[in-house]
């Protein structure tokens, strides 16, 4: 997830 979006969602780094 090197280019993951800054928003937190079900597909984000906070999943």
UniProtKB/Swiss-Prot annotation:
Domain of life: Eukaryota
Note: On the 2D-gel the determined pI of this unknown protein is: 6.8, its MW is: 71.0 kDa.
Protein name as catalogued: Unknown protein from spot 1131 of 2D-PAGE of etiolated coleoptile
């Amino acid at each position: 997830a090197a280019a993951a979006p800054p928003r937190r969602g079900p597909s984000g780094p906070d999943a």
